[in-house]
Amino acid sequence: MEKQAETWIAPGAVVVGDVTLGCNSSIWYNAVVRGDSAPIEIGENTNIQDGCVLHVDAGFPLKIGRGVTVGHAAILHGCTVGDNTLIGMGAIVLNGAQIGKDSLVAAGALVPQGRSY
């Protein structure tokens, strides 16, 4: 794991593997960030809220841009999320999906594998 200045990881959060955390990013309580099969990059000023799961498969890295909020209990799996985007609570974004900058993924939404928005 590589951390930049002012990064915060809550007690009870788990961050393992090939994970890069940008400046002023935060990982909140009970979130799991597992870069065990491919890298995970979390941009600066991004927050991963309580209970989120961020994971990867071989060939499907996870890249989260700057200024992103990933809402409580969301699951991001091997996808790309653009800058200044909100991933709503309980949303699921699957391998190879691409969410553009300045976007909103609704709470509880499912973004299927390989889709781009």
Where would I find each of the regions flagged by the language model?
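Short, charge-rich, low-complexity interaction segments located
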Residues: 115-117
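Left-handed beta-helix
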Residues: 5, 10-11, 16-17, 22-23, ...
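Phosphate/pyrophosphate-binding betaalpha-module
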Residues: 39
